Structure formats: C-alpha cells, structure tokens
C-alpha cells in the first residue's frame, strides 16, 4: 500500500501562558499594524488535529487558523489591555503582505472552534 498522510499548517499558536503579545510588548516596534492575524488557540490546534485525523480525507493539506482575523493592532492592543501589559508600538511597513489564511475545507468538514476569538474577553 501507498503512504497516506494529512498535512496541517497551523497558524501562530497561543494559549495558557503562551501569547505573542508578551513578546511583542518588549519590542521597540511591531510592523504592519493593519495586517490581519492568523492565529490558533492551543485547544483548537489539538481539537482540529484530532478532528481531522478522525473525519477528514487523507492526502490533503489543511490550514489550522481561527476563523477570526482582526488587525494586528486591534488584537494585540486588546490582548495587552486584558493582560495588563504595555501596548506594543506599531509602525507601517508598506512592503509587508496582508494575507488572511482561511481554509474552506476545514469549515466544510464542520469543526467548531472552541476559542474562535482566541481567548479574548472582549473583541476589538
């Protein structure tokens, strides 16, 4: 028999003690504030991997990202506020891409994200 596999490309991972705003708050500047975020919460990364292994066709590539894509600035300012951290400083970088990663296959397979708003109490 041939080798069959699934490839799952996960977005930036966050959850529990892992949150990118903790590192970004320490940087002198974060570029491209209007770019969308492409993140996934740890509980959804695990849940999606299990869900795909049980229900999805093999020999496919999937993108594991939350369905919500606010701008970097909106998301990280709100996250910093909720975590009582200093807000990152932002600057434009016109050469950077504004790519939203979605996966209609994941949506059509019916996975229900547990943390679609990536753990924020309030959304920007």
Where are the regions a protein language model picked out?
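Structural element of the ATP-grasp superfamily
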Residues: 1, 105-107
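Conserved beta-loop-beta element that borders a ligand/cofactor-binding pocket
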Residues: 1-16
């Amino acid at each position: 028999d041939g080798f069959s596999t699934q490839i799952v490309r996960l977005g930036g991972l966050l959850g529990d003690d892992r949150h990118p705003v903790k590192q970004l708050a320490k940087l002198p500047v974060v570029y491209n504030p209007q770019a969308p975020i492409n993140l996934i919460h740890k509980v959804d990364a695990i849940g999606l991997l299990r869900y795909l292994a049980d229900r999805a066709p093999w020999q496919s590539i999937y993108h594991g990202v939350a369905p919500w894509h606010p701008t970097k600035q909106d998301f990280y300012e709100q996250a910093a506020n909720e975590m009582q951290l200093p807000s990152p400083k932002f600057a434009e970088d016109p050469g950077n891409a504004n790519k939203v990663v979605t996966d209609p296959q994941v949506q059509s397979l019916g996975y229900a994200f547990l943390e679609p708003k990536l753990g924020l109490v309030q959304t920007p």
